[in-house]
UniProtKB/Swiss-Prot annotation:
It comes from Pisum sativum (Garden pea). Its main location: nucleus. This is Proliferating cell nuclear antigen. GO terms for biological process: leading strand elongation; mismatch repair; regulation of DNA replication; translesion synthesis. One of its GO terms (cellular component) is PCNA complex. This protein is an auxiliary protein of DNA polymerase delta and is involved in the control of eukaryotic DNA replication by increasing the polymerase's processibility during elongation of the leading strand. NCBIfam families: pcna (TIGR00590).
Length: 266
């Protein structure tokens, strides 16, 4: 038996909005410690890892480890029916091929339940090794989203370069080029508006902007984003979910030679 009750139901809606563009079908894994998901995007370039810890739920019951295959677009459609202030409960019986979403208004004068068929999804769990990163940048998530959006009007790729001067985002395309530099600033009164850079050695890596723009769909989940870079590893773009866990996106850097074949189709 699985029963999870989340008072801040809008959180689940935001989580789904942040990942449904990248991943169509995925297994949600429930255990005694939390509700998680790990899935590759359809082109096997990006990986999404989600964790919602059990202690972040008002009520969390998971009698045994359970994997529930769901179509994320269908799940998002159901969650759209919940009001932003609604309490969301997710229920599934052992051996059942359906999951139930229950939405309660805060005054409890309206209760809706939606049942969705589960899917059989073959998915392999990729071991994500803990790594030491050459550079870690923490910055306001809205600023990162704006930079990715602005640069994608010029080019298809972004070079993220971290040095003593700060973090530089640059692109070039048919109409010209653009560089945006963010310097470390920790003196601001509001810590969530700070840009903090930890660097062991300089790093410069190139990534497809369409993926970065997709990752920024998670901006509503957190006021800051952490970008971890190392020359031989995928970048990690992490949005912490207050008191509960995180959404992490992993993306392999682009190598110059494969630039042509990975260009998005017009």
């Amino acid at each position: 038996m699985l029963e999870l009750r989340l008072v801040q139901g809008s959180l689940l809606k935001k989580v789904l909005e942040s990942i449904k563009e990248l991943v169509n079908d995925a297994n949600f894994d429930c255990s005694s410690t939390g509700f998680s998901l790990q899935a590759m995007d359809s082109s096997h370039v990006a990986l999404v890892a989600l964790l919602l810890r059990s202690e972040g739920f008002e009520h969390y019951r998971c009698d045994r480890n359970l994997s529930m295959g769901m179509n994320l677009n269908n799940m998002a459609k159901m969650l759209k029916c919940a009001g932003n202030d609604d309490i969301i409960t997710i229920k599934a019986d052992d051996g059942s091929d359906t999951v139930t979403f229950m939405f309660e208004s805060p005054t409890q004068d309206k209760i809706s339940d939606f049942e969705m068929k589960l899917m059989d999804i073959d998915s392999e769990h990729l071991g994500i090794p803990e790594a030491e990163y050459h550079a870690i940048v923490r910055m306001p998530s809205a600023e990162f989203a704006r930079i990715c959006k602005d640069l994608s009007s010029i080019g298809d790729t972004v070079v993220i370069a971290v040095s003593k001067e700060g973090v530089k985002f640059s692109t070039k395309g048919d109409i010209g080029s653009a560089n945006i530099v963010c310097r470390q600033n920790t003196t601001v009164d509001k810590p969530e508006e700070a840009t903090v850079i930890e660097m062991n050695e300089p790093v410069a890596l190139q990534f497809a902007l369409r993926y970065m723009n997709s990752f920024t769909k998670a901006t509503p989940l957190s006021s800051s984003v952490t970008i971890s870079l190392s020359n031989e590893l995928p970048v990690v773009v992490e949005y912490k979910i207050a008191e509960m866990g995180y959404v992490r996106f992993y993306l392999a850097p682009k190598i110059e030679e494969d630039e042509e074949e990975t260009k998005p189709q017009a």
